Regions:
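NAD(P)+-binding Rossmann beta1-loop-alpha1 motif at the extreme N-terminus of oxidoreductases
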Residues: 1-64, 89, 94, 125, ...
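Rossmann-fold dinucleotide-binding core
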Residues: 4, 9, 96-175
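Hydrophobic beta-strand scaffold residues
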Residues: 27, 47, 115-117, 158, ...
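Rossmann-fold NAD(P) dinucleotide-binding segment
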Residues: 51-63, 67-115
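Helical "substrate-binding/catalytic lid" subdomain
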Residues: 166-267, 271-296
């Protein structure tokens, strides 16, 4: 099986790396947080002293980092990773970043004889742990076919969105819609509650009606309506407000670059920005319900 280097062992990267180990891959890992590195090493991964050291002898390099700036620094800046990667290696970046950044890094990788895919994911930490992630891939079809067995060890659905950067664009579109959807659902549930409706009954009605949506079915923002969702544990865990705000910011950047109109996306961005500024940045994004409820 392929020798893999995995860089970035945070809330998403760590369970993804563990699933590769479970699938039998030889894994060398690196993270700037020593505790995260040590945890994967205990599970069978080989800890590297640096990112460049981790890619020595690797056939596939995977990164999962927080933002565009981190990906740029790793591959193009102070991380100096690209020169350390052997020609012919496949590079897969699973971070959610600006499409322009993905294109720039892929171009630099190609200049060094490397194939690179942008492969952001959907499914959250639960999907990462259960190996049911959706991979949204941009890059050459041949590179994707080479990556498919590895991605299949970490996820359930794999889509080829198009050329380099297309995976990021599709992911941004999806998350913009999700942010809008959650804010709208929170508003509808709050309206129903204010008018005397049982929110659980209202949710059941909407699930069987034209307002049906993913958030309503599996991620209800109202505490107590669903078990095992962030709303029923004080909005702890899940997908943070600040992460949603980051993705809505990426959508705004993409819209500006292409002169696309996203009025609802911008409104959602403003709402999550207000929510974050009020101290909710680390809470799950479904906590936008609290902002709606606080409005007078």
């Amino acid at each position: 099986m392929s020798r893999i280097a995995f860089i970035g062992l945070g809330n998403m990267g760590a369970p993804m790396a563990r699933n590769l180990l479970k699938a039998g891959y030889t894994l060398t890992v690196f993270d700037i947080v020593k505790a995260s590195l040590d945890a994967i090493a205990k599970d069978g991964g080989k800890a590297a002293a640096s990112a460049p050291a981790s890619v020595a002898g690797a056939e596939i390099v995977i990164s999962m980092l927080p933002a565009s700036s981190h990906v740029e620094a790793l591959y193009l800046g102070e991380g100096r990773l690209l020169p350390a990667i052997e020609k012919g290696t496949l590079v897969i970046d699973c971070s959610t970043i600006a499409p322009q950044t993905a294109k720039a890094v892929a171009k630099a990788a190609a200049a060094r004889g490397l194939s690179m895919l942008d492969a952001p994911v959907s499914g959250g930490t639960a999907g990462a742990a259960a190996a049911t992630l959706t991979f949204i891939v941009g890059g050459e079809a041949a590179a994707l076919e080479r990556a498919r067995p590895v991605l299949s060890a970490m996820g359930k659905n794999i889509f080829h969105a198009g050329t380099s950067g297309a995976g990021q664009t599709a992911k941004i579109c999806n998350n913009m819609m999700l942010g809008i959807q959650m804010a709208g659902l929170a508003e509808a549930l709050a309206l129903g509650a204010k008018n005397g409706l049982d929110v659980k009954v209202l949710s059941e009605i909407m699930q069987k009606s034209s307002g049906r949506n993913w958030a309503l079915e599996v991620y209800n923002p109202w505490p107590g309506v669903m078990e095992n969702v962030p709303a029923s544990r004080g909005y702890a865990g899940g997908f943070g407000v600040d992460l949603m705000l980051k993705d809505l910011g990426l959508a705004a950047e993409a819209a500006l670059a292409t002169r696309a109109s996203i009025p609802l996306g911008e409104l959602a961005r403003n709402l999550y920005s207000l929510h974050s500024a009020a101290g909710a940045g680390a809470l799950d994004f479904s906590s936008i319900l609290r902002l709606v409820q606080s409005a007078r």
